[in-house]
Structures are given as C-alpha cells and as structure tokens.
C-alpha cells in the first residue's frame, strides 16, 4: 500500500486547499522542489502533483515548479501530475519532461474521445481522477456535479486502457474527516485496474482500514493536509502500511 504525498501547486508555492476553494489556500512551502526532497527522504515511493492554477485555467501553469521537482526527485521515484491536462500535446510534453503518469480529470468526463486517444498514444501513463459526491461525478475543480455514476464511468475508462483510477470523495477532502473506504471498495470491486484512494486521509485508523481491503484492488492513498499539519506522521504511516501489507 503506497502512501503518496500530494504537492498542490499554486502560484509556484506548495499549498493545501479546503474543499477545492482557491481562496481557502494555506501555504506550506515556497520551494516545491525542497518539499519533494523532504517526502523522498521520509520514504515516499511516489509523488502526486496537482497544478491548481492549471486545473482552473484548463492548461498547466506551474511549469517551473514542476520542472524543479522533477530535477530534484524525478530520477528516483515516479511522479504523477494532474491539473489542466486537456490535450495530447500537453501529455506528450509531460511525459517527455520526466513525469511517469498524467492524471486526467474533467476532460475525461467531458471529452471521452480525448481520453481514449490518450490511452492509445501513451499506454501505461494515463490515470483518471474521478471526483465524486454521493456516487455522482463532479467536474471543473469540483464546482459542477454531473449525473454520471462513478462506477459506470470508471468501467468505461477501464475499457479504454487507463492505468488506474484515483477516487476522491469530495465531501471529505481537506476536511480531515476520514477516508470513504466503503465507496472506494465498491469502486475497486467493480474494476480490474488499481484504485488509489483520496480525500480525507486523517490518521492511522484510515491506514489500517485501507490495508484491510488492499486485496480488493486498492493500491495506495493520496496524503494531503494530514501529513502537512502534522496530524499524521508520513514515515510512520508508510511503515505501518508496509507492515500490514506484508
């Protein structure tokens, strides 16, 4: 079970948002590359980057910070990026620049043809980020709730050839209220591709609960606010996951 620290980028800084609101940003570091090195030193085996400006603008906006992170740790652990990835040229630039995976969110829902083409052109590199509330998919930085059922969409994307699904329960993200394990398991059971849990990881109870259902196809979880504000010790969490998964 991978605990994957998130580095959320806004205006070149590492921040955390509350429930996806740009005006609710807390700055944790002025140097995202140093932050990346910190997580690597703590035993991270993968990093999750989000270009927040990019997510809202529809194209990547934190290129310098992303490049600095990849220069710092890209040769040592896989790095994945989401936020504003809406065309094949952007994906190509990301992969050529050293990213292992790109995460497609809103564009997957709005433009499934693009997702299909991306999976064909870059097999093994495409992750879909599905954000849902009460089982329904949300788009556009969580601002719009669609009528799409999350399991139905995920199955379709699996057929396209996506590498994995990151499932975020947006009612919980950044609120430190615990992961929605039940909904994540329900999704993982319906798929054969891996699922990464996200949204609301708070403490060791979440790690224990996740490891108990690892066999359903849940391979990791994104760690955000909890590992930044100190309520969850990252290294201890990964050590626990390794022990329980052994």
UniProtKB/Swiss-Prot annotation:
<dbReference type="InterPro" id="IPR011060">
    <property type="entry name" value="RibuloseP-bd_barrel"/>
</dbReference>
<dbReference type="InterPro" id="IPR023016">
    <property type="entry name" value="Isoase_HisA-like_bact"/>
</dbReference>
<dbReference type="InterPro" id="IPR006062">
    <property type="entry name" value="His_biosynth"/>
</dbReference>
<dbReference type="GO" id="GO:0000162">
    <property type="term" value="P:L-tryptophan biosynthetic process"/>
</dbReference>
<dbReference type="Pfam" id="PF00977">
    <property type="entry name" value="His_biosynth"/>
</dbReference>
<dbReference type="InterPro" id="IPR013785">
    <property type="entry name" value="Aldolase_TIM"/>
</dbReference>
<feature type="active site" description="Proton donor">
    <location>
        <position position="131"/>
    </location>
</feature>
<dbReference type="GO" id="GO:0005737">
    <property type="term" value="C:cytoplasm"/>
</dbReference>
<protein>
    <recommendedName>
        <fullName>1-(5-phosphoribosyl)-5-[(5-phosphoribosylamino)methylideneamino] imidazole-4-carboxamide isomerase</fullName>
        <ecNumber>5.3.1.16</ecNumber>
    </recommendedName>
</protein>
<keyword id="KW-0368">Histidine biosynthesis</keyword>
<feature type="active site" description="Proton acceptor">
    <location>
        <position position="8"/>
    </location>
</feature>
<dbReference type="GO" id="GO:0000105">
    <property type="term" value="P:L-histidine biosynthetic process"/>
</dbReference>
<comment type="similarity">
    <text>Belongs to the HisA/HisF family.</text>
</comment>
<comment type="pathway">
    <text>Amino-acid biosynthesis; L-histidine biosynthesis; L-histidine from 5-phospho-alpha-D-ribose 1-diphosphate: step 4/9.</text>
</comment>
<keyword id="KW-0028">Amino-acid biosynthesis</keyword>
<dbReference type="InterPro" id="IPR006063">
    <property type="entry name" value="HisA_bact_arch"/>
</dbReference>
<keyword id="KW-0963">Cytoplasm</keyword>
<dbReference type="InterPro" id="IPR044524">
    <property type="entry name" value="Isoase_HisA-like"/>
</dbReference>
<dbReference type="GO" id="GO:0003949">
    <property type="term" value="F:1-(5-phosphoribosyl)-5-[(5-phosphoribosylamino)methylideneamino]imidazole-4-carboxamide isomerase activity"/>
</dbReference>
<keyword id="KW-0413">Isomerase</keyword>
